[in-house]
UniProtKB/Swiss-Prot annotation:
Expressed by the skin glands. Thanks to its abundant amphiphilic alpha-helices, it may integrate into membrane phospholipids, leading to lysis of the membrane. Its hemolytic activity is inhibited by phospholipids, but not by cholesterol. Has antibacterial activity with a broad spectrum against various species of bacteria including both Gram-positive and Gram-negative groups. Also has ichthyotoxic activity. The keyword Oxidoreductase does not apply. This is Grammistin Gs F. Exists as aggregates of 3-4 molecules. GO terms for biological process: defense response to bacterium; killing of cells of another organism. One of its GO terms (molecular function) is toxin activity. Keywords: Antibiotic, Antimicrobial, Cytolysis, Hemolysis, Secreted, Toxin. GO terms for cellular component: extracellular region. It comes from Grammistes sexlineatus (Goldenstriped soapfish). Belongs to the grammistin family. Group 1 subfamily. It is found in: Secreted.
Length: 25
């Protein structure tokens, strides 16, 4: 379970950063 969270959390942050970049552009 923890391994899944460790893989899931970075992907969520990546998605949020991508959304922020799209808004800036």
């Amino acid at each position: 379970l923890f391994g899944f969270l460790i893989k899931l959390i970075p992907s969520l942050f990546g998605a949020l950063s991508n959304i922020g970049r799209n808004r800036n552009q």
